[in-house]
Design a protein with these regions (language model features):
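Conserved beta-propeller blade signature
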Residues: 1-4, 53-55, 103-105
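Solenoidal tandem-repeat scaffolds enriched in leucines and small polar residues
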Residues: 1-25
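Short loop/turn segments immediately following the C-termini of beta-strands
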Residues: 7, 17, 59, 69, ...
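Structural signal for beta-propeller blades
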Residues: 10-13, 23, 62-65, 112-114
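Gly/Pro-rich loop segments of beta-rich domains
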Residues: 19-44, 70-94
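Blade-level signature of beta-propeller repeat domains, shared across WD40, Kelch, NHL, RCC1
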Residues: 91-121
Length: 121
């Protein structure tokens, strides 16, 4: 599988690789930006955890959304949805990644920092 964040389309597409690769929308509503649980606004980086949950840097909503497998609604796990520079705020988060301990790292573009969020026990 290949997952592509479609910034202008406000969605994440899942491509099944193969001779006749098929695609489907995995998260967000194509062409419908928004800030509710099912919508994204300019998604950028994405990553999966070892449980199959998808984490998306929802850039213009200034939040990190987690989508569980087969779920249409995301859960905001970091960020407030507003621009800011406190410890749980972002100013255009661009990418997300996990380390081997499942700590989450977020590149926070216009705050010129990388934020680390400890694994939730």
């Amino acid at each position: 599988m290949l997952y592509i964040a479609n910034d202008a389309g406000h969605s994440v597409t899942q491509w099944q690789l193969g001779m006749y690769g098929t695609k489907s929308v995995y998260a967000g509503i194509p062409g419908r930006p928004g800030d509710n649980a099912a919508q994204l606004r300019s998604p950028e980086g994405l990553t999966f955890d070892k449980y199959g949950n998808l984490y998306i840097a929802d850039c213009e909503n200034n939040r990190i959304q987690m989508f569980c497998p087969n779920s249409l609604d995301g859960i905001t796990i970091a960020g407030t949805g507003q621009m800011g520079n406190s410890s749980n705020e972002f100013y255009f988060p661009h990418d997300v990644a996990f380390d081997s301990e499942l700590n989450l790292y977020v590149t926070d573009t216009y705050n010129n920092r990388i934020q680390k969020f400890a694994r939730i026990q």
